[in-house]
UniProtKB/Swiss-Prot annotation:
It catalyses: L-methionyl-tRNA(fMet) + (6R)-10-formyltetrahydrofolate = N-formyl-L-methionyl-tRNA(fMet) + (6S)-5,6,7,8-tetrahydrofolate + H(+). GO terms for cellular component: cytosol. SUPFAM superfamilies: FMT C-terminal domain-like, Formyltransferase. Belongs to the Fmt family. InterPro entries: Fmt (IPR005794), Formyl_trans_C (IPR005793), Formyl_trans_C_sf (IPR037022), Formyl_transf_N (IPR002376), Formyl_transf_N_sf (IPR036477), Formyl_transferase-like_C_sf (IPR011034), GART_AS (IPR001555), Met-tRNA-FMT_C (IPR044135). Its EC number is 2.1.2.9. It comes from Burkholderia pseudomallei (strain 668). The gene is fmt. It comes from the Bacteria. It is an enzyme of class 2 (transferase). This is Methionyl-tRNA formyltransferase. Keywords: Protein biosynthesis, Transferase.
Amino acid sequence: MTHSLRVIFAGTPEFAAAALAAIHEAGFPVPLVLTQPDRPAGRGMKLQASAVKRYALERGMAVAQPPSLRRAGKYPAEAVAALDLLHATPHDVMVVAAYGLLLPQEVLELPRHGCINIHASLLPRWRGAAPIHRAIEAGDAETGVTLMQMDAGLDTGAMLHEARVAIAPDDTTATLHDKLAAAGARLVVDALVELERTGALAATPQPADGVTYAEKIGKHEAALDWRKPAAALARQVRAFDPFPGGAGTLDGATLKLWAADAVPGRDDAAPGTIVDIGPDGVVIACGEGALRVTQLQKPGGKRLPAREFLAGAPLAVGQRFAPADAA
């Protein structure tokens, strides 16, 4: 099936690429794709194209990669060129998903139907940069995807559609990301079909209550504070997989802890102390309960199941991870 609604797409990572793929496969014309400039990545730090750019180029779509869209910003010449291109490209709506650049008012007002954002949370909860991580970290039972009509604020626009997704007890940011990317892709296609058919989408202002912000994830957040309850640390490990992981310092070496669950602990063990080692994992005392770590990684090594890790790097009951503030 082909459609007449012309969609400019702006996005960068895999989450956005899933939406672009769904829009393209549904038959909507995409006359232009905006994505971030190529960035150094990987161990060799070679320039790599974004997931959105790779998908678009493989299908012959026009791609632009301005470092900014602000005329008065750090890259005025590049911004002006990109804005001229947007003005010269006939389109009806812009879909934005994890693009990574601020859209000035000029861009928000350019499409006939405005700019629709795909946000990976149930707004107004978890506005901001890291909604998937923060939902898991906080212990939310569910999250979802919200389509909103973009305005000048940070994820403050009126809500158009939403899809709810349960957070499974073993979900990591990686697995939940994929569920939400698929949900967002379906949601935006349904919305575009409705927009083409009816000419407008019903918009509901976000409620004033329940607003929270999902701050960007920092590498420093990997450090596990063993004084916390084991359940909170297990959520932290899941929330920070694949980045930045959970981390603990043992005898001066920083170990990455990639998979863990909360188990009953011992009252006589200081937080951070290894209280049991077995084929099922390494059990570490916490402020409340204990954390059973089932996947570990030593510096320069690979992620390994506990059994394989211990075969090459034995640990002992009684060893103690350094406090987070001393690591």
